[in-house]
Amino acid sequence: MPSLNEIRSTFLNFFGGHGHEIVDSSPLVPRNDPTLMFTNAGMVQFKNVFTGLEHRDYNRATTSQKCVRAGGKHNDLDNVGYTARHHTFFEMLGNFSFGDYFKEDAIPFAWDLITKEFGIDKSRLLVTVYHTDDEAAEIWKKHAGLSDDRIIRIPTNDNFWMMGPTGPCGPCTEIFYDHGDHIWGGPPGSPEEDGDRFIEIWNLVFMQFEQFEDGTREPLPKPSIDTGMGLERIGALLQGSHDNYDTDLFKTLIEASAHATSVDPYGDKNVHHRVIADHLRSTSFLIADGVMPSNEGRGYVLRRIMRRAMRHAHLLGAQDPVMYRLVPALVGQMGQAFPELGRAQALIEETLMLEETRFRQTLDRGLKLLDEAVADVPEGGALPGETAFKLYDTYGFPLDLTQDALREKGRAVETEGFDAAMADQKAKARAAWAGSGETADESIWFDLAETHGATEFLGYDTEVAEGQVLALVKDGAQVAQLAEGETGWMVLNQTPFYAESGGQVGDSGGYLKSNGSGAIHDTQKRNGLFAHKVTPKAQPLKAGDVLEMRVDPARRTAIRANHSATHLLHEALRQALGAHVAQRGSLNAADRLRFDFSHSKALTLEELQKVEAEVNAYIRQNSPVETRIMTPDAARDLGAQALFGEKYGDEVRVVSMGRQSGSGKGVSGETYSLELCGGTHVKQTGDIGVFVTVGETASSSGVRRIEALTGEDAFAYLSAQDYRLAEVAASLKAQAADVPERVRSLLDERKALQNEVAQLRRELAMAGGGQGTAAPEAEAVAGVPFLAQSLSGVSGRDLPSLIDEHKARLGSGAILLIADTGGKAAVAAGVTADLTDRLSAVDLVKAAVAELGGKGGGGRPDMAQGGGKDASKADAAIAAAKAVIGG
């Protein structure tokens, strides 16, 4: 009996032996189809190949595609665990032809594989065809030898596939297996077709037409093939069961769940183990493909799946987290076929444990409330919607989890009341928004967020991705289109463009579409939406357009380097200055970075050099930059740095870089820098290139600011500095290495000359030389010796020392000196100690300054200084001082 792994290999090798390229599964988050929440079919990754928008090096392919159906119209969540074939995660085996072969080869390929390679009894097989597809029916007769009664013609769209209202389409043929009359059910097309006797195992789609808007169809020049066969279904059949949960893979997971909970795997609690086994697969693969639990979008679907599994673990009596303990069993079963599962194992386990721990804190209280409420609801009745909403709003119970719990009790949920309570909450939120002071222009973003939900950000993994235009905004109002050359704002369902936040500027770039293009100037965050400032260049831009979004790669690279450098800078400052250093703000632009941090004084040159050297040391280390998702508390317990004043949600992204011995902080190893951050970063620290500080200043009280450059900008700055140094060296007629000593020597020489000049000025002033108009000898004013001089060629700094020299010469008296400093006046007055009890130098200065066009003046009774605007009024100033003495 072949295992599922062997069946997968047989399928892929069969088609590989028939010239098909064996292509790896694409991620569960589709990159080329923004209309899909998750990849749900094998053809998703080939959509653009089928439509001619993409060319590959092969024209036939085969895959085993990871698929999830748990959101949107493809939502199997409620049935999972209770039926034989519903899953949230499954593998779709498929073979594809892109204009190479068609029906005459596709049907024989399928028949030969299932009857010869898999050895399925031909007598158990029957097929359906579209009622007008005589060609397919004839091939089945000719190659498989099927009689007319085993070729069922279906007139409905069940056997006609369409990619959309327009575009490629064509008939299908499906292969069914008859499990026998001991199982209830009828053949396809019969009233009993929903039974389990006849099970579809393979669907072959013949893309042979193109449908136009008027409903007409024309043959495609190169018809193509798209087939899909569920691995779990064919596996159950080949292992002798009609229940997918009886296959070897699910048995392993169910038994692991039973071991972890100490509950019989196949007793009356079996359904709980089945739910856990299925949900373990979908949650693990979603996390491995980059989806993290959240309250919106794909993350919310993941959280719903996780919490549903966790409730079933609770029903098995589990008191501690269970699901993370089952991951090794899953990796053992599927890790070889999907290596990404093993690579992400630690992240999967940690995410599951954190989510289950957090949810368990509210699960008991929520279930108690539910039990109390159900006591008042008769069997077959419905729980009031308001109660279900309280469970959702207060305890984080998704509606489908409550419905799932009630189904086991024979009750339902009154969904109209739930919807009404949800609408009421939104109305209150809208009223709060309206009263918050936001402008009418800004309130449009609340409406759009309520309608469309948060934008899915893809930019951690790619700089190019498709997105569908959900809304266009111009002058604060929603518009249907933006004309060529008109600038407005654009919202998409998903985008690779980073919206400005956390100090990192928004991305810019452009977009392409089938018949046009445009420029994206900036990206801003508006109430959870990513708003792109856009100008169409060729053709108008319309709501509903599907765009290929392209981030400016050079600009993004520079921004990433600067952002990662701020993380290294933050830790280097903490190492150099102390643990008190904390981020107070930052700017991570393409051409520079700015980092504000708590510190009370300017950094010394030695401190700056130490910080710069340490940052560059970790750049040269070229260590990987890693990201993890965890709770804020868990991140802080690890020592992660958080932005001052920032509010964080239930999960945070933790960025780590650099390795050092003995730090003990690392998520994996001894991490140098560990920060909560939602921005984009380099993959290796070496990608930063080089780091150089260009300024250190005060930002505000107790906050310093460092400005710096990285990468090409840093190299350009260093090159310019080197050129300037060479110019200085040439001017000094010295080698570059000797410039500092040569400059110090010149400065010492200059200082000596300045001192000599100052001394000569003082001597000249004391001698009454120069252009002084007052006599150097004192005159008696009201019995007080008073010496006054108006001087030129003397600076204000020289006046106090001249005052002291005059005091020493006079012995007793008052002095007033006025220096002409380019038309303005510097004033100083002095009074000897024996006279300060009756005369103050401050009063003399104030009187003089008033005449010179100045204000104030101050100092001590024995020495005061001031200044005025007009030195030509020196005589009047001296007279005013005399009046003070004589007064």
UniProtKB/Swiss-Prot annotation:
GO biological process: alanyl-tRNA aminoacylation; negative regulation of DNA-templated transcription
Compartment annotation: Cytoplasm
Primary subcellular site in the record, as a coarse category: cytoplasm
Cellular component, GO, one term: cytosol
UniProt keyword Ligase present: yes
EC annotation from Swiss-Prot or TrEMBL: 6.1.1.7
GO MF entries: alanine-tRNA ligase activity; aminoacyl-tRNA deacylase activity; ATP binding; tRNA binding; zinc ion binding
Catalysis: reaction(s): tRNA(Ala) + L-alanine + ATP = L-alanyl-tRNA(Ala) + AMP + diphosphate
Broad enzyme group: ligase
UniProt-listed SMART domains: tRNA_SAD
Keyword check for Ribosomal protein: no
Family per record: Belongs to the class-II aminoacyl-tRNA synthetase family.
Role description: Catalyzes the attachment of alanine to tRNA(Ala) in a two-step reaction: alanine is first activated by ATP to form Ala-AMP and then transferred to the acceptor end of tRNA(Ala). Also edits incorrectly charged Ser-tRNA(Ala) and Gly-tRNA(Ala) via its editing domain.
Name of the protein in its database record: Alanine--tRNA ligase
